């Protein structure tokens, strides 16, 4: 991991002297991006970065953990246990123009930072998002591994599920297999839905039992070295279900069409609109209005790394981006189908990871 290269990407176009990242009960993903730390929680820790180096302000609790992982360009200071030492360490921001992540920083932490008298506090969340859009070879390798673990886990569980199992049992199996294959955790809580529940895109697994002929939807993602996968599979369990099988076949074809359209220079937002129009017009409109979410999103340190397919500043596709592509159709009272894969944008188009 080249710390200085990542700092150059963040500071490019940002009119700031220093970057300040403040973790809360969870880590700001940009803390992970700049440190590469894969162990430790670093709750309420600070990161202060110049254009050349990163300083982590931590406590006795995390000091050795941070020190053992610090690469070239990263300094670690054990100062959070002492008000005097902390004030001395953070005094570097006094009179300086400070960039912060406005998408993560709490109002209380913003006010705490103001007390140390920076000349300006500027929200550079767009710079941070932009810096992380195009992935390095190391990042791509981590995402590829996370995807591989996720796909294998879903396949293994699909072979072992039986009628009478609950959604919660299947979700637990998926999580167990991913961990046993080396995942450090989940990108998000695993979604498992049976039957009518598959019509709810973000259904959380419950005690619903699997019946013969049910639609089964599994949406999950392993995390590997901080990097996420996001994969969804929908299938019919047991006896044939013609309507459900036709829906699955259609959604798979739509996903292939969408992936084929993703190339450097293409507007992802327009691709999403074209896909929606196609779904709405298919066979006289039998699926009209049933595609109720975006075509996909960025994937990386977060399961939803950036709204590439939305009407956002990040919609122009670039080589090196990693994206999740997830068309779906949903019928309340019957069920839904979503197929999701993660792709890497190469110079010639999208490669399914």
Which stretches of residues belong to each language-model region?
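Active-site neighborhoods and metal-handling regions in enzymes and metal-associated proteins
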Residues: 1-353
């Amino acid at each position: 991991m080249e710390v200085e290269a990542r700092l150059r990407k963040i500071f490019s176009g940002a009119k700031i002297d220093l970057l300040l990242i403040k973790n809360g009960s969870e880590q700001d993903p940009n803390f992970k991006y700049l440190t590469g730390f894969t162990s430790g929680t670093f709750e309420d820790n600070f990161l202060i970065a110049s254009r050349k180096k990163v300083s982590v302000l931590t406590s006795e609790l995390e000091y050795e953990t941070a020190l053992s992982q610090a690469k070239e360009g990263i300094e670690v200071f054990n100062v959070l246990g002492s008000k005097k030492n902390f004030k001395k360490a953070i005094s570097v921001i006094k009179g300086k123009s400070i960039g912060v992540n406005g998408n993560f920083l709490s109002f209380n932490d913003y006010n705490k930072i103001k007390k140390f008298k920076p000349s300006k506090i500027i929200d550079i969340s767009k710079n941070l998002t932009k810096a992380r859009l195009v992935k390095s070879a190391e990042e791509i390798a981590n995402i590829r591994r996370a995807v591989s673990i996720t796909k294998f886990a879903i396949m293994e569980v699909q072979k072992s599920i039986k009628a009478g199992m609950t959604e919660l049992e299947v979700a637990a199996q998926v999580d167990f297999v991913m961990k046993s294959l080396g995942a450090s955790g989940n990108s998000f809580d695993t979604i498992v839905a049976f039957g009518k529940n598959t019509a709810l895109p973000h259904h959380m697994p419950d005690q619903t039992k699997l019946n013969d002929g049910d639609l089964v939807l599994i949406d999950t993602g392993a995390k590997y070295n901080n990097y996420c996968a996001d994969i969804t599979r929908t299938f019919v369990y047991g006896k044939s279900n013609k309507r459900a099988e036709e829906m699955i076949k259609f959604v798979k074809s739509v996903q292939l069409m969408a992936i084929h359209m993703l190339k450097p220079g293409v507007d992802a937002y327009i691709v999403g609109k074209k896909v929606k129009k196609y779904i709405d017009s298919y066979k006289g409109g039998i699926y009209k209005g049933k595609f109720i979410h975006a075509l996909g999103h960025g994937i990386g340190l977060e399961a939803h790394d950036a709204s590439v397919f939305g009407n956002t500043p990040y919609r122009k596709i670039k080589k090196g981006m990693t994206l999740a592509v997830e068309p779906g159709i949903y019928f309340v009272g019957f069920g839904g189908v979503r197929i999701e894969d993660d792709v890497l944008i190469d110079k010639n188009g999208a490669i399914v990871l």
